[in-house]
Amino acid sequence: MQGSVTEFLKPRLVDIEQISSTHAKVILEPLERGFGHTLGNALRRILLSSMPGCAVTEVEIDGVLHEYSSKEGVQEDILEVLLNLKGLAVKVQNKDDVFLTLNKSGIGPVVAADITHDGDVEIVNPEHVICHLTDESASINMRIRVQRGRGYVPASARVHAQDEERPIGRLLVDACYSPVDRIAYNVEAARVEQRTDLDKLVIELETNGTIDPEEAIRRAATILAEQLDAFVDLRDVRQPEVKEEKPEFDPILLRPVDDLELTVRSANCLKAETIHYIGDLVQRTEVELLKTPNLGKKSLTEIKDVLASRGLSLGMRLENWPPASIAED
C-alpha cells in the first residue's frame, strides 16, 4: 500500500448483511485509526435523534375524558392503550398531518389492521395489538392523529397557550418520530497489507419497517455530510447588513417657507421671488434678498433670526438642489 503519509485511507469495502426486512448489519472498512468511533458515534446519534418519520400525536376515544381512566369492556386501561398506539408504524405519502379512525366492537383483540385510512397512508405493522375487548357488547371508537416530525417530542413540549381551548377528551401522546428502533456500533481491528492499526466499523440497526435499514444509514450519512459542508469552505455566510440610506437633504429644507411663520410682508416678498421652500431660501445671500422689492433690513433680520432658530442660515450651498420630488412639482 503506497501513498503519502498525509493521505487518508478511504473505505473500500462496504458489506451489508440483511438479517431481515427491518434488521441489517453494515460493515465499513478500512478506516484510519480512530475514525471508526468518530463516524460510528456521529451516525448513531443522527439515526436515533434526527431521522424524520411519522408518529401518533393525539387521540380521541369516545367516552374517555382523560388518560388516567379506563373504559368499560376494554381490558387495558387508557394509559396502556395510548402506549400501544405509540407502537404503530405508519408511512404517509404527500402529507404531514393525517387523521385515522378506528371503530371496533365484539370480543377479541383490536389491531392496527382495524384502523380506517386513505390511500396515502400505509400501516406497516397491521398485526400490532392496540387493546382487547372483553364483552360482546363492548366497542371502542377513536380518532387518531398522525403527524410527520423528527426525533422525540414529549407531549409537554407541544402544549401551547392556544391548547387551553383544546376539547376535553383529546389526549396528547409523546411522539417518537424516529423510524429507528435500535442502533449499535462496534469498532474492530482491520488490516491492509502491513498496516494493522486500522479500524473496521460494524453498524447494526433495526427499524420499525417504515424505512429500509440500508436507506436509513444512507440518509443519516447525507445529513451528516450536509452539516459538515459548512466547514469545508469557511466563508462568512452572514447576511450583509443593510445600511439605511440617509436622506440627501435635511427634511426641514423640503418644507415650504410658510412653515417659518414669517410676517405677511416678508412671506409675500419671498413668494414674489419664487422662493417656495426653505431650501430655496437658505441658498440666497443677504445681498440678493435686499434686492427683492419691498423687502427691507427689518424683514431680512426677521428671516435670519427665524432661520437661526432652526440651525440654518443664509448663503448655504446645497448640492443637487432641487431634489427630483420638488423639481417634478
From Swiss-Prot:
Residues 249-329 are annotated as: Alpha C-terminal domain (alpha-CTD). Residues 1-235 are annotated as: Alpha N-terminal domain (alpha-NTD). GO terms for cellular component: cytoplasm; DNA-directed RNA polymerase complex. It comes from the Bacteria. Keywords: DNA-directed RNA polymerase, Nucleotidyltransferase, Transcription, Transferase. Its EC number is 2.7.7.6. It catalyses: RNA(n) + a ribonucleoside 5'-triphosphate = RNA(n+1) + diphosphate. GO terms for biological process: DNA-templated transcription. One of its GO terms (molecular function) is protein dimerization activity. InterPro entries: DNA-dir_RNA_pol_insert, DNA-dir_RNA_pol_RpoA/D/Rpb3, DNA-dir_RpoA, RBP11-like, RNAP_asu_C, RNApol_insert_sf. DNA-dependent RNA polymerase catalyzes the transcription of DNA into RNA using the four ribonucleoside triphosphates as substrates. Belongs to the RNA polymerase alpha chain family. NCBIfam families: PRK05182.1-2 (NF003513), PRK05182.2-5 (NF003519), rpoA (TIGR02027). This is DNA-directed RNA polymerase subunit alpha. It comes from Pasteurella multocida (strain Pm70).
